[in-house]
Regions:
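Short, contiguous clusters of charged residues that form electrostatic/catalytic patches at enzyme active sites
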Residues: 29, 187, 191, 462, ...
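Short acidic-hydrophobic, aromatic-tinged amphipathic segments that line or gate anion-handling sites
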Residues: 529-545
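Short Gly/Ser/Thr- and Asp/Glu-enriched loop/turn motifs at secondary-structure junctions
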Residues: 308-309, 515, 532
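Short secondary-structure boundary/hinge segments and terminal tails
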Residues: 291, 332, 519, 538-539
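Transmembrane helical cores of multi-pass ion-transport proteins
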Residues: 1-429, 526
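Conserved SAM-binding loop
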Residues: 76, 510, 535
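The feature marks cytosolic C-terminal regulatory regions of anion transporters and related permeases
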Residues: 361-529, 547, 554
Length: 555
């Protein structure tokens, strides 16, 4: 039962001290965030290859459950730009039915991640990988909008990055300059509107202005209504047809959705923690994300996760409890019921412009450039490779390869800093220098002392075989206070050293063995082999033990 307290939604704990004043702030913030989410939800749905209302279904259903069950006070859930390229690719290959099954499976995976406390493992994904795949996704989003932004007369846009570029190049002569002008106007409005008001999103103003201009002047610009039939009304429950072959086929896409949802939602939660001074429950958040995606799929939605920009807007506008996220969902529901038909007049180039700005903002190119200038070459290599794999292949391959590469490079660095040092012995003429040698001890003449620095693991095991046993010595002390961890390869090195010492008539003494290496030795029976009396708590005890052995030998 104790472990399940980490899954308790934040809503249930914050409501104990809930006030009318905070309720009013949450309602106002929820309304503002809904206004921000409206154009984004529609634009992201269309860019993903589904109907506009499906973006709102996602923001309403997933957004509600992510707030209601989540481990963050202020998380706002819904469709995000990070999923656009992934969803588009899934639909192109497996259809909407495949996307629904993948989203259901991803929801189940996220719930299991939360139940098994995987939320704490996300922190082990290096920042270079998250920056790399985020930049790759952002680039894919921007490139995916070129058709609608330029008004190109062409068929369906290929899912692959290279295929998109080739298709655009073949159809570049069909550009519509009126459509381009509307798109540029939408971008300019989004760039400069924040100087007028930061409360009302520039994307909403861009939609209102461009829709008005296209309708009044009857401009030859394609609108949502030209391409989609928009449905107003409540989403209907639909149970997809599921077969074993389809489940097996959708396992990788589902895993991609689950991993990305977990990473983005927990990153958003961490950002909001920094803004509010609170602390989220990562495993409860994963369970909420799973339930949100599961329910979204059953009611015609698409994958969802925590949206960093909308969550930040929630905090800035006074939202401090999950009530704000729930108000945001109910507000979007009212818009869906009563205002959705008017969305058919929105120009496609305006939506493309909105997503181009979203892609630009999420790219984090400034952070990327700073890292390229300051980070080690190995980190830059991980970033660039992850970016390219995301762009030209897919997110799972990028993360898997990036993690393996980052792990190998880390092990290489750990191996490079590992070393063995033999203690230096000073003569009586060097007494004036003794005070500077903090670790300098009296060492019996029968003893030779080595000190190991670094992890004693397979990548550095060969470094620790360079021991000289010395002539006329009968005791070898290995000081291990700077060995934090050891694996089976490191243990085998110690066993080889012990075997060599026994053949040469030397006693091996280990000094200051840390907890983890001691546990490995005990489990493998090495402590019995070396003798418990030859494992000493510190170097002083080791030297004292060596001196006694020397006296015994003389006697």
């Amino acid at each position: 039962m104790n472990s399940f307290k980490y899954l308790k939604p934040k809503l249930f704990s914050v409501m104990k001290n809930y006030t009318k004043e905070q309720c009013l702030k949450d309602i106002i913030s929820g309304l503002i965030v809904a206004v921000i989410a409206l154009p984004l939800s529609i634009a992201l749905a269309i860019a993903s290859g589904v109907n506009p209302e499906q973006g709102l279904y996602t923001a309403i259903i997933a957004g509600f459950f992510i707030s209601f069950l989540g481990g963050s006070r202020v998380q706002i859930g819904g469709p995000t730009a990070a999923f656009v390229v992934i969803i588009y690719g899934i639909i192109a290959e497996h259809g909407v039915a495949g996307l629904t099954v993948a989203t259901l499976m991803a929801g189940g995976m996220l719930i299991l991640m939360g139940l098994f406390h995987f939320g704490d493992l996300i922190k082990f994904i290096p920042k270079t990988i998250t920056i790399g795949f985020t930049l790759g996704i952002a680039m894919g989003i921007v490139v995916g909008q070129i058709k609608d932004f330029l008004g190109l007369s062409m068929g369906a846009v290929p899912a692959e990055f290279v295929g998109k570029i080739v298709a655009y190049a073949h159809n570049i002569k069909s550009i519509s300059y009126v459509t381009l002008a509307v798109g540029i106007l939408a971008i300019l409005i989004q760039v400069f509107w924040p100087k007028v008001s930061k409360k009302i999103p520039g994307s909403l103003i861009a939609i209102l202005v461009t829709t008005f201009l296209v309708a009044i002047f009857k401009l030859p610009v394609k609108t949502i209504g030209d391409l989609y039939t928009i449905k107003a009304g409540l989403p209907s429950f639909t149970m997809p047809t599921i077969s074993f072959s389809l489940v097996r086929e959708m396992m990788l896409p589902a895993f991609t959705i689950a991993v990305l949802a977990a990473i983005e939602s927990l990153l958003s939660a961490v950002v909001s923690d920094g803004m509010t001074g609170s602390k989220h429950k990562s495993n409860a958040e994963l369970v909420a994300q799973g339930v949100g995606n599961f329910m979204s799929a059953l009611f015609g939605g698409i994958p969802a996760t925590g949206a960093i920009a909308r969550t930040a807007a929630n905090v800035k506008n006074g939202g401090r409890t999950p009530v704000a996220g729930m108000v945001h969902a109910f507000t979007l529901l009212l818009i869906l019921l009563f205002l959705m038909p008017y969305a058919s007049y929105i120009p496609m180039s305006c939506l493309a412009a909105i997503l181009i700005i979203v892609g630009y903002n999420m790219s984090g190119w400034r952070t990327c450039m700073r890292m390229v200038k300051t980070a080690p070459n190995s980190d830059i290599a991980v970033l660039v490779i992850t970016f390219l794999l995301t762009l030209f292949f897919d997110l799972v391959i990028a993360i898997e390869f990036g993690m393996v590469l980052a792990a190998f490079l880390f092990l290489k660095r750990m191996s490079d800093i590992a070393e063995v040092r033999q203690w230096t012995y000073k003569g009586s003429s060097d007494d004036d220098k003794l005070s500077e040698e903090v670790d300098l001890k009296y060492v019996p003449k029968n003893t030779i002392v080595y000190e190991i620095f670094g992890a004693l693991f397979f990548g550095a095991a060969n470094v620790f075989t360079n021991f000289e046993h010395g002539e006329g010595k009968n005791v070898l002390i290995i000081r291990m206070r700077n060995v934090p961890v050891m694996d089976i390869s490191g243990l085998e090195v110690l066993e080889e050293i012990l075997e060599t010492c026994q053949k040469r008539g030397l006693t091996l003494i280990l000094s200051h063995v840390n907890e983890q290496p001691y546990h490995v030795m005990g489990k493998a029976g090495f402590i019995e082999k070396i003798g418990r009396e030859n494992l000493c708590v510190n170097i002083d005890a080791s030297l004292e033990r060596a001196e006694k052995l020397g006296e015994t030998q003389k006697a």
